Amino acid sequence: AHLHLHSTYSLLDGAIRPADLVNKVKELGMKSVAVTDHGNMFGAIEFYDAAKKAGVKPIIGYEAYVAPGSRFEKRNQEDLVDGRAYHLILLAKNKQGYKNLTKLASKAYTEGLYYKPRIDYELLAQHSEGLVGLTACLAGEVNRLIYRQQMDKAAELSGRLNEIFGKGNFFLEIQNHGIPEQIEVAKGAAELS
């Protein structure tokens, strides 16, 4: 199953409608698929309904933007080390996970909105029950550390995320779209695991 996928609800990053997605997934013989739109869950119900109708198991997710510090901190992006929030894939394992996803997505807008709707690790730790975490794309914090060859810091953060999500609920995501940086990070992730 694809566990990191953007629909039309990921503005400027996703092109497929939820109904078209589940129809294609079914056509390919896949039994399940996740939708992890950037910073929102606007399409979650539409996706869930379409997947159920098509006989495909829907995995509800969310690609969170994680503030480099506190979600309450608002300052010029130029002052930030990386200039933006990190990405982190969150997947609901169960009903409690879905509730926590909705809390995180809502609080990202009401408490952490600064250019993007952001959460932080404090909020994630409070609402991690029932969630699975993936390191996301090259914009994920662990992956950025790997790319910079800061393996000790990447291992430390991976350990922290493993504690937040609980054993067996945090994974290093490997992507290969032919981008040299992804291949380099994949090698580092394999070394880290």
Where are these regions (language model features)?
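Phosphodiester-processing cores and adjacent nucleic acid-binding clamps
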Residues: 1-193
